[in-house]
């Protein structure tokens, strides 16, 4: 057999070998080829809606503690405690509590579900009776979001909080300021600068203002005296 014949035979054998490999599913991947792995997110985001539904409970005078007393404009039987979910300043889901009038329970649940879905941050949320004498100043300095508290306004009339029809959100970073310079909380002077970008701040036209307004609630940030950035109410 000549050299040319050997080369032709080798070529034919090679072609048959290639066909056999193709019929068997193609050539094997090169040794050391990288494996494709789908990485899981290291910081998974919570679902758009709370995993746990809001829970509504009646309250009595004992449960309200120092936040209620005889002579308040509403009886404990008119109030409800809502346990609901919120996104904290740490970006995680938390459970908190608000006491509100029974007539606005549906509003409040819907509002905080909407704020949860857009991940608006709330630092903490607990009823004011957790603070000595249910002191509003202490709750505000703690940046605590709260609702019912039987307390009067400086004018002597009842605050809408005394009716369970008002909510204060992140009050340290959203302070109250009167024309005479009455600042609440007193530790919030730095946050009178509304160009700051601290989380939890509320600004005109933002998602918090729009969400409350859609349910007929008024924002104290629209008032002229006082200006109350933390405050939302429904009469």
What is each of the regions a protein language model found here?
Residues 1-28:
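Secretory targeting and sorting signals
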Residues 19-70:
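N-terminal low-complexity, Pro/Thr-rich disordered segments
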Residues 40-51, 74-75, 105, 213, ...:
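Post-signal peptide N-terminal regions of Sec-secreted extracellular proteins
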Residues 152-158, 163-235:
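Catalytic cores and adjacent binding grooves of peptidoglycan-active enzymes
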């Amino acid at each position: 057999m000549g050299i040319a014949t050997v080369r032709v035979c080798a070529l034919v054998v090679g072609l048959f070998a290639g066909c056999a490999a193709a019929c068997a599913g193609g050539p094997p991947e090169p040794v050391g080829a990288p494996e494709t792995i789908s990485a899981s997110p290291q910081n998974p985001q919570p679902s758009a809606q709370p995993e746990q539904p809001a829970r509504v409970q009646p309250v009595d005078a004992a449960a309200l503690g120092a936040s209620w007393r005889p002579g308040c404009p509403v009886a404990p039987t008119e109030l409800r405690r809502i346990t609901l979910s919120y996104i904290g300043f740490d970006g995680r889901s938390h459970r908190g509590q608000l006491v509100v009038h029974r007539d606005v329970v549906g509003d409040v649940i819907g509002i905080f579900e909407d704020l949860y879905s857009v991940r608006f941050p709330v630092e903490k949320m607990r009823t004011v009776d957790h603070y000595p004498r249910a002191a509003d100043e202490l709750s505000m300095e703690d940046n605590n979001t709260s609702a019912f508290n039987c307390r009067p306004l400086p004018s002597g009339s009842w605050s809408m909080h005394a009716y369970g029809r008002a909510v204060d959100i992140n009050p340290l970073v959203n302070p109250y300021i009167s024309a005479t310079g009455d600042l609440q909380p007193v530790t919030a002077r730095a946050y009178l600068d509304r160009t700051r970008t601290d989380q939890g701040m509320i600004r005109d036209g933002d998602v918090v203002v729009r969400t409350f307004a859609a349910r007929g609630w008024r924002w104290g940030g629209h008032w002229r005296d006082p200006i109350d950035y933390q405050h939302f109410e429904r009469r």
